[in-house]
Amino acid sequence: MRFDDINSRMDWNRFFTIKKVLEKYNIKSILGVVPKCEDKTLEVGKKNLDFFGNLRRFALYGDVIAQHGYSHIYDSKSSGFFGNTSNSEFAGHPYQKQVNKLSKGKEILEKESLWSPIFMAPNHSFDSFTLKALKKLGFNTVLDGFALFPFKSDNLYFISQISSKPLPVWLPCLSQLCVHVNTISDKELKHLIFFIEKNHKYFISLDNLQIKNNFLTLFDRKFISILMKFFRSFKKFNSFGSTIFFKCRCLFQ
């Protein structure tokens, strides 16, 4: 279970609604914390005055704190390795600039006794310079990748994030269930809670992961990568086709 965009002014009511259900079943989450949030689109509620205090309590419970970038400002038009759109906080920037951003974010979390060597890229976007910078700063895990199971590459562990929706439990895979509390609809929230209630026994924490690299791992990564790229291309084509159709219909009307 993973929460993105954790910041002091997110929708805390929805977050605690989900958190209460997770703790009912002793499920530990991954919390993607934006160290210095400057993205105004993520500020939807009143400021949580005990933001870092809450995070420390979550960490004591067993939740994992991941560094979700630095400021969450997309100041690059590069999509990087896994990004779906050409907007990034990291990909496309020079190596030293990426080191500086990551270092500043790490320093903030370390000051609050919250840093762990786990990186969650804003917009799922990063490049080879990002990975080089992460290793320089002591990170060992990246919460992204196209694969059915976690894998290790270039001395970094990658935990796949295939879908933001609950996947059928019969699928032979392990993926992060990604939640954005600011944008989840009432219908989606209800479905998510139902899914957790019904399938709580299948949730695991990062500590329980066993990562093995072999021939099947390589095949898995290649196959899922091709499949995801095809799916994204199909979505873009379908969206483009729908736009053209409606414009033509309006023209004829």
Please give the residue ranges for each predicted region:
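Hydrophobic faces of well-ordered beta-strands that scaffold small-molecule active sites
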Residues: M1-F3, S29-L31, I65-H68, P117-F119, ...
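Active-site beta->alpha N-cap acidic-glycine motif
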Residues: M1-Y61, I108
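Active-site beta-loop-alpha junctions enriched in small/polar residues
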Residues: I6, V34-E38, Y70-H72, F146-A147, ...
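Acidic-and-aromatic substrate-binding clefts and catalytic sites of carbohydrate-active enzymes
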Residues: I6-R14, P35-F51, K77, Y95-Q96, ...
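Generic structural signal for well-ordered alpha-helices
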Residues: F15-K19, F52-R56, L102-K106, L131, ...
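C-terminal domain-boundary segment and adjacent tail
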Residues: N26-V33, V142, T183-Q253
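Short, flexible, mixed-charge acidic loops at enzyme active sites
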Residues: I73-T85
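Catalytic domains of cell-wall/extracellular-matrix polysaccharide-remodeling enzymes
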Residues: E89-Q161, L189-K190
